[in-house]
């Protein structure tokens, strides 16, 4: 009522409201009401500035223009670059800028994290939190890590560059195919990498034996009797592929990228699908006493968890 009463008042149009932690002592529904009310006020001539520690106070619509204020012993209080400005710095063409903003803005948690872990697919996003907590006894929130799903790997390099421009440490988890289809283009592997070449020869052997279709020496889904993801898993299981894949894994790890050495996360966890029922059942299994014995690659998962923790340590 007050807004409607004064909306034409020139003095009110320059009113600045400064609010510290408007979400304090409120239940989630009330926090949402406050957020909406402040948003409405900002559209009615008020200038609203609020400080918050709650991801609920910042929607994906506002992530890219939010200011990130941090404090540490080395730098004192400082402001990180806005996501919108970082994207413009890294991505030059406007359509790609919009795509990148949409991809990263979908996770408002990264605004409150000291460290971001990018994932390629939804499986990692759905099962890694429970898996990580079961293996380490710590949650992602406890190590101040935001798990951000990309929905694909084509933007991995640019996403990492944007977050680096925002002064946010970042690591990424990708499927094995990334090393063969994108890592060279992104500059993480040399074009003539000997380990990639060796594994490419193994693809040719599989294509001859299994009548698979390759395009530019790589497995594809179209017009092939075996899905590309399955072919990568088949190649990764070959004894002669173990050393070159391990080499590829180590090269990418040094650059902040974890590649699944068995093809994809499903092979390491023994998952037989990519749907909510499979993910939910796995998260329930995480709570069982004999869970560790059921993992096909416990050692690899334990190493991954330590790698994630090491990434959080690099932020201090």
Describe each model-derived feature in a short phrase:
Residues 1-106, 310:
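Switch/communication elements of ASCE P-loop NTPase nucleotide-binding domains
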Residues 100, 104-118, 122-316:
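Acidic, Mg2+-coordinating catalytic modules of nucleic-acid enzymes
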């Amino acid at each position: 009522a007050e807004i409607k009463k004064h909306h034409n008042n020139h003095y009110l149009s320059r009113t600045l409201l400064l609010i510290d932690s408007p979400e304090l002592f409120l239940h989630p529904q009330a926090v949402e009401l406050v957020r909406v009310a402040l948003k409405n006020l900002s559209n009615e001539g008020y200038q609203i500035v609020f400080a918050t520690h709650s991801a609920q106070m910042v929607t994906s619509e506002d992530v890219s223009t939010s200011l990130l204020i941090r404090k540490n012993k080395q730098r004192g209080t400082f402001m990180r670059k806005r996501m919108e400005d970082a994207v413009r710095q890294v991505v030059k063409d406007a359509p790609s800028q919009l795509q990148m903003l949409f991809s990263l803005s979908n996770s408002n948690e990264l605004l409150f994290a000291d460290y971001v872990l990018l994932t390629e697919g939804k499986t990692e996003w759905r099962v890694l939190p429970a898996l990580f907590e079961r293996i380490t006894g710590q949650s992602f929130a406890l190590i101040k890590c935001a798990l951000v799903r990309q929905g694909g790997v084509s933007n991995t390099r640019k996403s990492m560059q944007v977050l680096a421009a925002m002064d946010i440490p970042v690591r990424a988890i990708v499927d094995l195919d990334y090393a063969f289809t994108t890592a060279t283009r992104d500059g993480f592997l040399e074009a003539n990498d000997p380990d990639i070449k060796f594994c490419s020869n193994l693809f040719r052997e599989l294509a001859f034996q299994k009548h698979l279709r390759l395009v530019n020496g790589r497995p594809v889904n179209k017009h092939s009797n075996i899905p590309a993801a399955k072919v990568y898993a088949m190649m990764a299981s070959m004894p002669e592929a173990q050393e070159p894949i391990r080499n590829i894994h180590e090269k990418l790890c040094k650059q902040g990228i974890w590649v699944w050495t068995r093809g994809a996360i499903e092979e390491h966890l023994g998952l037989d699908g990519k749907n909510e029922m499979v993910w939910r059942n796995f998260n329930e299994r995480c709570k069982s006493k004999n869970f560790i014995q059921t993992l096909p690659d416990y050692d690899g998962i334990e190493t991954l968890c330590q790698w994630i923790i090491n990434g959080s340590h690099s932020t201090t």
